[in-house]
A protein has these predicted regions:
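N-terminal, positively charged/glycine-rich alpha-helical extensions of SAM-dependent methyltransferases
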Residues: 2, 10-42
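Conserved alpha-helix/loop element of class I SAM-dependent methyltransferases that forms part
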Residues: 50-71, 81, 85
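Core SAM-dependent methyltransferase catalytic element
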Residues: 234-256
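A short glycine-rich, Lys/Arg-flanked "PGG" loop and its adjoining helix->strand segment in the class I
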Residues: 157-172
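Class I SAM-dependent methyltransferase Rossmann-like catalytic core
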Residues: 38-52
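A short SAM/SAH-binding and catalytic strip from SAM-dependent methyltransferases
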Residues: 142-156, 179
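Class I SAM-dependent methyltransferase SAM/SAH-binding core
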Residues: 71-134
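C-terminal alpha-helical "lid/dimerization" subdomain adjacent to the S-adenosyl-L-methionine
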Residues: 28, 118-120, 176-234, 240
């Protein structure tokens, strides 16, 4: 029977970095934000992407290299979309772990699991945890995914280093997120859509301020080239970023 473990700290412990207090405060604020949007998160994803996010997520799973019998990890799993797809890939003989720092998102994921009948979904374990301090030994997983999560962590270098640490040599991580384009026109169109469509729709759910955060988070994110360099810096042997969704989305694939 699948389990829901909620005993892990979801706020980073102080580190040697001089900005550790700021990191803790920002992490707590982001955790609270995702708890607030949890009840309508799935509906908004479908509405705002016209269902296209499901295609992008299947592409991300394919790029992860997960296969039958594998031990796979989905970081920043939210309500579990990628975790369920990973579970289908690894099958009943494999294992899938969905980790997130939002208790509310995990409760929704666990509820969704109980309503689904596929045998493979019994191999899923939900955990509340911190992407900056993954609670797993080195070389634990055959595949890792992170969807729309790396952009939201407060220390991307540490998060990628942790992913590299828990992956087995030769295994891959697939990182799906909004694409920070270097094309001024693409950036302008993306921001226009966020301001006039995304925020407008979210305001109907009382979440205008929460989704205004999206534009600033993309501005603060890394370009495809920067993501590739980051992956190599933390120890991955190879990395390639792909633009998808008309260039508005991106997927980094990195090999341990």
């Amino acid at each position: 029977m699948a389990s829901l473990h909620l005993g892990l700290s979801s706020i980073p412990r102080p580190s040697f970095r001089p900005t550790c207090n700021l990191i803790i405060r920002c992490s707590a604020e982001r955790q609270a934000l995702f708890n607030r949007i949890a009840p309508v998160y799935d509906n908004l994803n479908d509405l705002l992407s016209l269902g296209q996010h499901r295609i992008w997520k299947r592409m991300a799973i394919s790029w992860s290299g997960a296969k039958e019998g594998d031990n796979a990890l989905d970081i920043c799993c939210g309500s579990g979309d990628l975790t369920f797809l990973l579970s289908e890939r690894v099958g009943p003989r494999g294992k899938a772990v969905g980790l997130d720092f939002s208790n509310e998102q995990l409760l929704i994921a666990s509820t969704r699991q109980k309503l689904r009948s596929k045998t493979c979904y019994k191999n899923i374990k939900w955990m509340e945890g911190n992407a900056l301090e993954l609670p797993f030994p080195d070389s634990s997983f055959d595949a890792v995914t992170i969807g729309y999560g790396l952009r939201n962590v407060v220390d991307r270098h540490k998060a990628m280093a942790e992913i590299c640490r828990v992956l087995k040599p030769g295994s891959m991580v697939s990182v799906l997120d909004f694409n920070k384009s270097i094309n001024p026109l693409s950036t302008a169109i993306q921001e226009l859509m966020i301001d006039n469509i995304v925020v407008s729709v979210a305001s109907g759910y009382g979440l205008e301020n929460e989704y205004k955060y999206l534009k600033s988070s993309i501005k603060d994110f890394l370009t495809g080239n920067e993501l590739e360099k980051l992956a190599l810096e933390v120890g991955f042997s190879n990395a390639k970023h792909f633009e998808i969704g008309f260039g508005f989305m991106g997927n980094l694939v990195a090999i341990r």
